Amino acid sequence: MGKVRAVCISEKRGTQKKNIESAVFVENWGIEGDAHAGNWHRQISLLSEETIAAFKARGAEVTDGAFGENLVVSGYDFTKFPIGTRFTCKDVVLELTQIGKECHHGCEIFQKMGECIMPTNGVFAKVLHGGKISVGAVSYTHLRAH
């Protein structure tokens, strides 16, 4: 079980996301108003609160959304879940589609810290069923049988 700690969006690509506390998740699209929403496999990005806290402990000065993550969730190590894992949070159902990503060359965090956690700890999902998620909501996992 996990708990949502931040819900973040950015209206333009290339800008840091901001915690808006609550958002509408649209089936096969992403978060309403987020620049990265669309009909593709990386509609939602997720990071664990624990991973962010460990990075901050090494001196990183980051806020929710700094890594481009849409959801910050406590209680999960997202890298331990296989592709296809489903997360439910109220009515919303997300399916894990990708683990990690290549950091872009202009990554401010990488330039300051010499590393970034998104390439190894960030995960991506698509929205299978829409609804609203707010900070404090509880999330459950469902491993898909292969």
Residue ranges and their predicted role:
Residues 100, 106, 120-124:
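Short amphipathic alpha-helical surface patches that serve as generic macromolecular interface elements
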Residues 83, 99, 106-108, 135-138:
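A short secondary-structure junction signal
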Residues 107-117:
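Short beta-strand-turn/beta-hairpin segments enriched in glycine/proline and small hydrophobics
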Residues 1-101, 132:
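Electropositive, beta-rich accessory/interaction domains or terminal extensions
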Residues 88, 139-140:
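Hydrophobic beta-sheet segments that form the core/acyl-binding groove
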Residues 127-135, 139:
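Glycine- and charge-enriched low-complexity intrinsically disordered segments
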Residues 141-146:
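Conserved small/polar residues in nucleotide/adenosyl-binding loops
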Residues 67-76, 116-126:
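Short, structured beta-strand/loop micro-motifs enriched in basic residues and often containing a Trp
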